[in-house]
Amino acid sequence: MAERLSPADIEAQLANLPGWKQVGDRLEQTFTFKDFLGSIAFVNRLVDPAEQAGHHPDLSISWNRVTVCLTTHDVGGITQKDIDLAKVISNLAVV
């Protein structure tokens, strides 16, 4: 089982994750795209990496925005799994 990261570890990791912030026990970022098709294309790109990691983000989709929330439910907080998936998601957003 993954271990919860300490507040200091989370802060240090967020320094390398531009745009991501800690909101309670989760990481969150809102990505903005040209239009709805861009938003949906981004969400579709998330599917395979999330499945491969066995770790699935909570998503909120609006016309040209996708808010991604990451937390590790079984430990009730942020783990390295969340940090790792946040890095992958950030890279997918710049395609």
Curated annotation (Swiss-Prot):
Keywords: Lyase. It is an enzyme of class 4 (lyase). GO terms for biological process: tetrahydrobiopterin biosynthetic process. GO terms for molecular function: 4-alpha-hydroxytetrahydrobiopterin dehydratase activity. The keyword Kinase does not apply. It catalyses: (4aS,6R)-4a-hydroxy-L-erythro-5,6,7,8-tetrahydrobiopterin = (6R)-L-erythro-6,7-dihydrobiopterin + H2O. Its EC number is 4.2.1.96. Belongs to the pterin-4-alpha-carbinolamine dehydratase family. PANTHER family: PTERIN-4-ALPHA-CARBINOLAMINE DEHYDRATASE (PTHR12599:SF0). NCBIfam families: PRK00823.1-2. This is Putative pterin-4-alpha-carbinolamine dehydratase. It comes from Thermosynechococcus vestitus (strain NIES-2133 / IAM M-273 / BP-1).
